[in-house]
Amino acid sequence: MISIKSLFIFIGCSYVLNCSAQKTIDTIATKLGNLAIPIKIYLPKKSIEKSPIYFFIHGGGWNGGTQNEVPPATLSGDVEFLADELGVIYVGLAYRCKGNNATFADAINDLESSVNWFLENGKRFNADTTRIGFGGTSAGSTLSAVLAQKYPKCKIYIGADGMYNLLDHDEKKSPFPNAEARRIYGLETEDKSKLASAFHNLRKNPPVSLLLHGKEDRLCHYTQSINFAKKINDAGGKAKVVLYDRINHTCLSAAYPEVFKQSVIEIANLFLNEFNIKNIKIETIQKALDKRLENQYPLENITESKMIGLWKSTNEDIIFKPDGKGEQKFNNNVKVFDYLFEKGGVKIVVQQQKERLFYLRKNGIVMYELFSDDSEKMYRKLDFRKNKFR
């Protein structure tokens, strides 16, 4: 079984569409001794007036980091579709993690320092510092939700696959954060966990919040979003929850095109309404999404000729040969399999192993395994890329 830490590292490096490097600024927001805290800034191409700011905090289970380096700042997957079209500045924030021998409180200090640095330098980036928002995915949602309560000018909050109340936590439903992660990251007491929970620290007039969650989330149970939204609404704020069937901790990954498209449209509408952005048609964004995501959908009719060859994932090779035969190579072990086509996919049958089901994306160069067993990986996809030289 895959470990919680390995799954979080996989999620933290999940599929994000590429954006133009010319519009992205990578710099250092603050330093702690010899440890630099980076910041990634994406400036919209067509903004004329001052632009609102969206601060994004990555997930990854608070894993990563060394004595000399923190995990990098990243941008959310919707940046390609919304930054230029809506004229929003996206700012990716970094913070010390468990590998830096840091705590949750240290991470909040890092993030506040970076946010304050950007706001103080807002004129350099043509930023409207009166219109800001925060967002995060997975472990980043816990941090970003707390930050959103600290800044009165924060108008919106966006959380995906989130954990917002560390006191209401059943490890059987939500393995993150487990007792070991809490101990390492300075959340071992009830008081510290409460301080790290936006649920217990709502500000007066909380920001308008959008919470995205899969109903099959095996790391952070979807009731975290439902309960947090209720808390916000009961406090006089405004919160919306969007739940997805058969989705497991992947609400903002283009590898799940239908869910990704709906999530981006929800975010776009939130930006338009709460940042008061005018003269933008949501249909333009929908068309861009349809065009960009077309090749991410599965190919309906797969033929043997499209599958023959070598397919590689991070640590496994799969070779399809003619006449329904093939080989899988994992950790220097080679096993022969039979394969057949059914239900729009390819089923691999290996002796004394569970059957595996693969689908080919329309681009013809990436196939993915869909996990259907009742495990932490249920409904997740693992990509394999075709080797062009075989």
What kind of region is each of these model predictions?
Residues 226, 233-295:
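C-terminal catalytic histidine-bearing segment of alpha/beta-hydrolase fold enzymes
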